[in-house]
Amino acid sequence: MKRIALFCLLFVPMSLWAQKQYFLPTGDSSMDEKDRPMIEVYLPQQEQANGCAVVLCPGGAMRWLSWESDVVKMAAFLNAHGIAAIGLRYHLNKGGGGMPRGAQMPPMVDVTHPDRFPQADANPMHNAHGDSIIHLAEQDAKAAIKMVREHAAEWNINKDKIGYLGFSAGGGVAIAATMSATAIERPNFLCSNYGPSLMPVTVPVDAPPLLIMTRADHPNVAAGLVALFMEWKKAGANAEIHMYGDGNGPYELMPETGATTTETWSRQLILWLKAKGFLSQR
């Protein structure tokens, strides 16, 4: 029955779930509205709400956002577990600054060499423009946490149960935001789904518990996330990692058919949140 319910959630249209949209103060009012940083709020039924809220940072290589898979479908899944979901639209690299045409591809690092990423920096192509976009997105992510805290009573959210779930590049954005957050911007938990750090990692003194999920054969990503896990542990912070052996790339919410262990990642997320006390009743 749970598998059937999850399968149905995968096809829930956006219009049924999005309840509120708020532009973030980090955006420029002169920007096209479709590009301005904003949050989209998806709230569970009030009688189901447990006070937990997850800010969803979708992937897309810092050039687009995988909104349907990483926000809309995940919001339906989280709402079904009593969790508020906050989709984040952050600054993107739409002005170039990537790898020049004809340039050699960066080396692909496998999971056995996390040492190739000092300070867990798994960004293979640093440049001034690209790094500036990451920093802008980082500010968006921090503003999102702050806005959720400011609306916590209105949205039936516990201020101490707000965290990130980042996918791919969105994981890098969430990690960067966590490292530089002030008290009101600080997440209570940090989850990265195949999203390594895009900047050198300095673990904050008050680092939140970290959950990492990825596939072992995902080039650069798996090694970068092992390096991130090690940085958290070396700092004495709480961290957990799930390294799935099947498949070699990104994935999304999926029904559990038994075909791969990766299918269980969303269940592991809920179990982890529950074990950390974030799903206990308000």
Would you name each region that the model predicts?
Residues 45, 60, 168, 216-217:
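Residue-level signal for short, function-critical loop segments
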